[in-house]
Each structure stands twice: as structure tokens, then as C-alpha cells.
């Protein structure tokens, strides 16, 4: 691996997903999840790989687009804030039944204390309800490392994986060692 660079949770998620081999990211804007998609859109590695990025009509269509990519065996990332889980609930819960082929990670950015939202909500309940694995990283390094694990787990279990972060975590920074193939060291 390379020398550690200073990364936010946002950057660790984006780099982790890119290095895990995603083919596309599908999102509906909402702080702080918007920044993940923006980072991927600007990433030289993502551009070189022709990684698809789409701002969707809503979170449900983002989930459906990611599932479509998964059904042909490719990996996808879905990004939304916590209230978006309400919008994509139908597609999210049913994806536990239909399953996935390529790995799908659903990133939900919860906002305890309503820093930039109209309500508080814990997205983990959707994962518990749908019997979908839930990952909640506690550091930037864990976040980066967990992305590869999340995609492997998704493909092994043939179900999406829910990853939860919070607004305040999203903007904190710490040293992260990225894969040797990764050329982006700081963000």
C-alpha cells in the first residue's frame, strides 16, 4: 500500500468503491452523500475506467438503476441521505428477495441532531427489516477497507449491503492507507 494520505469518510467511501471495481454510482443529492458521487465524477481513475455516474430522479430510481447494473454482473454504489431510504424502501426491501449478481452497496448518510435535514432517522432499521447486512464503519481506514468487503459480501450473499455513516463522521479527516493500485492519495 501507499503512504497514508489525509482522507474524509466521503473520500474513503468513494476511493474504496472505485478500488473495489464499481461500474457505476447512482444517487439523488442530499448532504453529505452528494459529495461521494461528486468525488467519483471528478476522479481521474473513475474517468479512465469509464465509470458511469448518474444523478437520478429520486432514490428509488437510483436503487433500481444500480440493481439493473447488478443483474448483468457488475458492481454498483447507491448514495442517498437518510430520508432517501424512505423513498427507495420498496426497491430496497424487494432487492433482498430478488437478489443481486454484481455487488450493490447502498450508502445511507444519516443526520443525527438534524445538522442539514428536516428530521432524524436511523437507516439501520431498513436493513434489519429487509434482513440485509448492515455495515457501520467507525474510522476512515475502516470505511475504505469495508468497501471491498461490502462488495464481496454482497456477491457472496447475493443481496445488497447497507452502509451507514453520519453527517458529522462524513466530514472528519484521518490518515488512510489506500491500495497500491490507487493513485489518488489525498482528498
Where does each model-flagged region fall?
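Thiamine diphosphate
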Residues: 1-141, 145-147, 166-173, 182
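Conformationally flexible catalytic loops at phosphate/diphosphate-handling active centers
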Residues: 157-187
Amino acid at each position: 500500500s501507499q503512504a497514508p494520505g489525509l482522507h474524509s469518510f466521503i473520500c474513503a467511501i468513494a476511493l474504496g468503491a472505485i478500488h473495489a471495481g464499481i461500474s457505476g454510482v447512482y444517487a439523488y443529492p442530499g448532504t453529505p452523500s452528494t459529495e461521494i458521487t461528486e468525488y467519483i465524477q471528478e476522479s481521474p481513475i473513475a474517468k479512465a475506467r469509464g465509470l458511469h455516474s448518474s444523478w437520478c430522479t429520486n432514490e428509488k430510481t437510483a436503487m433500481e438503476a444500480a440493481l439493473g447494473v447488478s443483474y448483468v454482473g457488475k458492481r454498483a454504489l447507491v448514495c442517498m441521505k437518510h430520508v432517501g431510504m424512505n423513498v427507495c424502501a420498496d426497491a430496497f426491501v424487494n432487492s433482498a428477495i430478488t437478489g443481486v449478481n454484481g455487488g450493490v452497496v447502498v450508502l445511507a448518510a444519516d443526520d443525527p441532531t438534524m445538522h442539514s435535514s428536516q428530521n432524524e432517522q436511523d437507516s439501520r432499521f431498513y436493513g434489519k427489516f429487509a434482513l440485509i447486512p448492515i455495515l457501520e464503519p467507525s474510522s476512515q481506514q475502516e470505511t475504505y477497507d469495508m468497501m471491498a468487503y461490502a462488495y464481496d459480501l454482497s456477491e457472496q450473499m447475493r443481496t445488497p449491503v447497507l452502509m451507514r455513516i453520519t453527517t458529522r463522521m462524513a466530514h472528519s479527516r484521518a490518515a488512510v492507507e489506500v491500495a497500491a493500485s490507487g493513485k489518488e492519495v489525498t482528498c
